[in-house]
Amino acid sequence: MPDIVQQGGTWGPMLCSNTVDTLGRKCIERNEHCYLYKNTAKILPLAFVDDLNGIAKCGLESKSMNRFLVTQIEMKKLRFHTADKNGKSKCVKMHIGKHNDFCPTLKVHGTIMPEVTEEMYLGDLLSADGKNTKNVKNRVSKGIGIVSQIVDLLENTCFGPHYFKIAMLLRESMLVNGITTNVEVWHSVLESEIEELQNVDKLMFRRLLNVPKSTPIESFYLELGVIPIGVIIKARRVNYLHSILGREQTGMVYSFFVTQWNSPTKGDWTELVQKDLEDLGIPSSFQFIRSKSKEAFKNLVKAKAKEYALKILQIKQNSHKKMKDLKYESIKIQKYFTRSDLSIEQKKLLFKFRTRMSDFGENYRAGREKVICPLCESHVDNQELSFICPDIKNKVVISGKISDIYMEDIKLETVEVIQKITQIRNLED
């Protein structure tokens, strides 16, 4: 048998891990080939299984690190992936910073390393400009596809009274996790970029409930009992902070974090997480955070995230007249969405009436002249007056009051009345 270890063999990963670990230890022992982050934290060549990433200042330092890494790999009788017949190579260099700085040519096994401005790694696009623009764009495109998958699954599978609960589980497992992977560790994340991700979330709600863009955004979360993506990212970032603080304090990640915490610059991750701690009402004391077990801290963050979500959603609710008749004390799915005596269409209709998105002229007037009821032409066309509309009363036995729809326990008779009213109005159209 040949005296070699194959990459895909049983011992391949162990040999690979040992090799990259040896590189790091040699850098520490020699006190060289380490990038000084903010002139304080030493950043060794980063390694993940068989991937290597060296960080160095342009010039002599980058040339020296390049020679060191290639030499160490060749001494192990290993090779980096150089350009193939199509000119594609897994070995690239990326220049960060001013372009007028001298950036030397780097070689791998005698082959010039191509320069790139971006590189995809583990689902994230690393950009020379340090921005998340393309990452967000990719996540949005991915999210739109996931929304279509979820809606298709819901429409072609019978979930009975569990339809909306299943929909929210699919949202969390497929959509939220699909478009927010690793986002908690991104730096320089802009509010506008978070909003782009949340727009995909809103798209799913609109398709799920068959409502227009003018539907109050907060109604989706308050009625269906879920937390906005922006708040989810805040919670995940704070949980990652707990993970960092639990690491060995002499380690590279912890050293990098402390350096950034003590000397922050605009867009740094530590600035984002400090704002998250403030928003969620969690003390920024390292001692306090470390004192909590992983599970206890996770539960604390979950509770605080719900409180914060409720607070910001209620602020939005107070700015919308359409939501004035609804009251919320916590983030939870409203009872009518889980009832077994209501059809999916009846639940969607209830949502529209509760949020004043039902098809009445006054619900969509937006500053225009008053709209008159198309049936009797004797009153303003709004959903409240539909219960006393002469034309409707001649065709439907009205039981209950329109205000019943804003209660926690909505009578079945009231739901049936608004369904019949909607059917009559649709026939008139």
Predicted regions mapped to residue ranges:
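Conserved, non-catalytic sequence blocks in retroelement Pol enzymes and Pol-derived host proteins
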Residues: I4-C16, Y37-K38, K57-L60, G130-N138, ...
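Extended C-terminal regions of large enzymes
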Residues: N177, V200-D201, P212-M357, G361
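Short, conserved micro-motifs composed of acidic
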Residues: T82-T117, N138
